[in-house]
């Protein structure tokens, strides 16, 4: 056991993650023979088989799973040590790990430019995914801060209200409803809706609104991408309800129109959340403070 190295643990974790020696080698920029040799040495150091290879697939043994868990703990401890050292060096270097649901991609990157200029030595990672993917990252404590439109109720987390997040009804400019004013919700339910997938923050907020008004949405198509939804709306397949931020690239005078519908825009919010048990590094805390000092830079008024 004493002869096991950090590099061997890193290689083993990559194999477990990818399920393949070849993919692990590609991920770590190593040759496959090097990966195989590292695993032989680690297995010898541990003293028991760590994996089984059936066909091209790698399966961890019980001992292998224990080693994987230990390697994750080792990596976490080293990351914490790196953050401490960065803290002591006065933010001259360090890591900032952020994650946001897909709609956040329209404004979160805007926040990073000036911060990066102030702290050029900080390495920033921004993960973008759907709500379920981001919640899984949160549950596994993979990042420092998370941007969500609807915080989960089943996790012990800190929740900071950040920005307004108006949800609007959009249609192609050729749609007959574009010329109308004060469109009733009853008329809206007769229109084919193109919506995000069930479980997304936007979908949940809209479903709640329609339920409160005792109406049922006429969802004819589900798409897990805001950009694809906009293309479908532009193509005349229906109307949709999205965050106004999702129109940042086209602008409010672009090919898609915001309809004047009763009860809209739905005034929702963006939240920044993180685990209550998490001790934010100085890097993460500095960025959090920076966000609330510069939130006007990504307000709806500034973007549009």
From Swiss-Prot:
Gene Ontology biological process terms, A to Z: regulation of DNA-templated transcription
Record gene name: cmpR
Domain HTH lysR-type, first and last residues per copy: 1-61
Name by which UniProt lists this protein: HTH-type transcriptional activator CmpR
GO molecular function term, any single one: transcription cis-regulatory region binding
Gene3D superfamilies named among the record's database cross-references: 3.40.190.290, Winged helix-like DNA-binding domain superfamily/Winged helix DNA-binding domain
DNA-binding region per Swiss-Prot/TrEMBL record: 21-40
Compartments it resides in: Cytoplasm
Similarity section: Belongs to the LysR transcriptional regulatory family.
Matches recorded under PROSITE patterns: HTH_LYSR (PS50931)
Pfam families, per the entry: HTH_1, LysR_substrate
Known role: Activates transcription of the cmpABCD operon under carbon dioxide-limited conditions. Specifically binds to the cmpR-cmpA intergenic region.
